[in-house]
Amino acid sequence: MSITQSFFVLTLAIFGAASDNPIADRKCIVISDGDLVMHERKPGQEFPYYVYMIPKGTEYDDQRWILESVGGDHYKLKNKFSGRYLVYGTFDYFLTAGAAVREMDHFKFTADGTGKYDISSKANGHPRSRGKNWGVMKDGEKHYFTVENCQE
């Protein structure tokens, strides 16, 4: 392989990998843990606006999150269905609110190199899946979620 061909292949690999990164401003992502996906409960459901893990199936907007950069490597997560933001709620449960103005509601995604990310807030809290149909809670330990681009 010539030097020119090698450079071309390397360039494709670098830019191809960069375009696959789901973590960027205004990107739409889905956050999952095994066969469960993070979603926002809707008005009319028990505990509306709380964030729960439900079985994967057809991808809907209540499972989609839009990243909004707040500077540096932190983001607000806006639910595509409601337009509300992921925040820490009462008793360390995650829910959504009309604004994410507190720094503790700004999140960083740290890749583990396998397509999974530890999500941490500026207050060093980490969302943790507690299983099927349970609310997502804040934890002090790292927890790696699969983060993928939306299937739109």
Curated annotation (Swiss-Prot):
Gene3D superfamilies: 2.80.10.50. Residues 1-18 form the signal peptide. Salivary gland (at protein level). The keyword Flavoprotein does not apply. GO terms for biological process: vasodilation. It is found in: Secreted. GO terms for cellular component: extracellular region. Keywords: Secreted, Signal, Vasoactive, Vasodilator. Disulfide bonds: none annotated. Salivary vasoactive peptide; induces vasodilatation in bioassay with rabbit aortic rings. This is Erythema protein SVEP. It comes from Simulium vittatum (Striped black fly). The lineage of its organism: Eukaryota, Metazoa, Ecdysozoa, Arthropoda, Hexapoda.
